[in-house]
């Protein structure tokens, strides 16, 4: 088995957010076709409502907690699950649902999705996926407005105007905004106007008024009252920011450039056709397409000390999934070796960034990183040091599955901070880690 296989350890304490059900990856087709078995989906209750009940009755039955025999609540017990809507059931929307469905005892309940294709497209594309394989969950069309996933009813609506979506009627707590369209305050704010409480944008946000969070980097800054609209950044920022944080803390980043060799996405053209970016207008499966990316600059949104120090470009290539970041930086610390750099990553991977960052020592290729749960995997054999202050680091990431795991993590973080949720942890990942690992070198600050 590949040595980079990541332990899918949560960034959220287990009383609020449990681990992915599998600790170790299987390669290469592990996502939902081999990794997620139906018997493991025990975290979701089957509906006990009869066939004549309305969709709303069925949803209520699934989210209202079962009666308990004691008047004393169990510490850390989730009293009621937060109701989630997915707006846009494309690559990230469907990956998010699969990732969420594989989590046991999630504090979330997906009750509705908005997709222009209706129930037929939503059910078929969820069940059969060219990258993930066949979903082992039972996916059925219940009626022309409802699908079921292992008996769990999910309403399907089709409306391109967020203001007309039934979020108030359904009591939606969190909207996963996955269209890539409503990424600014006015756009994403339409979900709030429609009755939702919170919005998580699965893309870089436009506007300084929307805070960005990258799990493993700055999630400790989130609080329920900080903002109603937040961003999970981009897949590339989720790859770059964790290891940039390690490099900056250990060696001090002076400046650097990044290139992401990125799989093609739906924003490109299958055949040559008009596009606002003339390079993305060219056939995605036939070309290496240089294009822009804001991922390097966006790192400063979660690591403010790096503002103005990083920049980069993207090369879109003819692969459907998995991407790789190549970062070259100048550092303050002199006299480093490649092993010094890799050791810093191993320390982070086994400590406060466990489940977010991993290190791979095997000579692998992109397909081996499909469905990697972590945000970033350092390819240790490609780490280089030139002169006394130049460092090159290469890191792999699954730009769909790994990113969607972080969206679930961020949604779980939002749930853990919800009014009435049991307070757990200090909010500082390093401090929480050091409570159980006091002998670790990084924990001396807490002595």
Swiss-Prot record:
Site, as annotated: Activates thiol group during catalysis: 262
Tree of life domain: Eukaryota
Tissue specificity comment: Expressed in leaves and stems.
Intracellular or extracellular location(s): Plastid, Chloroplast membrane; Plastid, Chloroplast stroma
Pfam family, one: Gp_dh_N
Transit pept. (range): 1-80
Function of the molecule: Involved in the photosynthetic reductive pentose phosphate pathway (Calvin-Benson cycle). Catalyzes the reduction of 1,3-diphosphoglycerate by NADPH.
Protein name as annotated: Glyceraldehyde-3-phosphate dehydrogenase GAPB, chloroplastic
Organism: Arabidopsis thaliana (Mouse-ear cress)
């Amino acid at each position: 088995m590949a040595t980079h296989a990541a332990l899918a350890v949560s960034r959220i304490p287990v009383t609020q957010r449990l681990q992915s059900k599998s600790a170790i990856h299987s390669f290469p087709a592990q996502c939902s076709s081999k990794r997620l078995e139906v018997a493991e989906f025990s975290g979701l209750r089957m509906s006990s409502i009869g066939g004549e009940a309305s969709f709303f009755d069925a949803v209520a039955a699934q989210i209202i907690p079962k009666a308990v025999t004691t008047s004393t609540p169990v510490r850390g017990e989730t009293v009621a699950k937060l109701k989630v809507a997915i707006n846009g059931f494309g690559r990230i929307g469907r990956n998010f649902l699969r990732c969420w469905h594989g989590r046991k005892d999630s504090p979330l309940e997906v009750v509705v999705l908005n997709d222009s294709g209706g129930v037929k497209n939503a059910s078929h594309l969820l069940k059969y996926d060219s990258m993930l394989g066949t979903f082992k969950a039972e996916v059925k069309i219940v009626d022309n407005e409802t699908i079921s996933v292992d008996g769990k009813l999910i309403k399907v609506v089709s409306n391109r105007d967020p203001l007309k979506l039934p979020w108030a009627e359904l009591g939606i707590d969190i909207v996963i905004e996955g269209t890539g369209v409503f990424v600014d305050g006015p756009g994403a704010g339409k979900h709030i106007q429609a009755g939702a409480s919170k919005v998580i944008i699965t893309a870089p946000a436009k506007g300084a008024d929307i805070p960005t969070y990258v799990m493993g980097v700055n999630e400790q800054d989130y609080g329920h009252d900080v903002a109603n609209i937040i961003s999970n950044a981009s897949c590339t920022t989720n790859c770059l920011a964790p290891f940039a944080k390690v490099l900056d803390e250990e060696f001090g980043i002076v400046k650097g450039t990044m290139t992401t060799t990125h799989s093609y996405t739906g924003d490109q053209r299958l055949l040559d056709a008009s596009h606002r970016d003339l390079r993305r207008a060219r056939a995605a499966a036939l070309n290496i397409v240089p294009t822009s990316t804001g991922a390097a600059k966006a790192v400063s949104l979660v690591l403010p000390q790096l503002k103005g120090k990083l920049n980069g470009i993207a090369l879109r290539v003819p692969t459907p999934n998995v991407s790789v970041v190549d970062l070259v930086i100048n550092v303050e610390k002199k006299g480093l070796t490649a092993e010094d750099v890799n050791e810093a990553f191993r320390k982070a991977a086994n400590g406060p960034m466990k489940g977010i960052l991993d290190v791979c020592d095997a000579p692998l290729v992109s397909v081996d990183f499909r469905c990697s749960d972590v945000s970033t995997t350092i390819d240790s054999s490609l780490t280089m040091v030139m002169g006394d202050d130049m460092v090159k680091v290469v890191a792999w990431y699954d730009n769909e599955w790994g990113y969607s795991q972080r969206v679930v993590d961020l949604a779980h973080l939002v749930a853990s901070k919800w009014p009435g949720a049991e307070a757990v942890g200090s909010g500082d990942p390093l401090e929480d880690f050091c409570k159980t690992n006091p002998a670790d070198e990084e924990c001396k600050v807490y002595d």
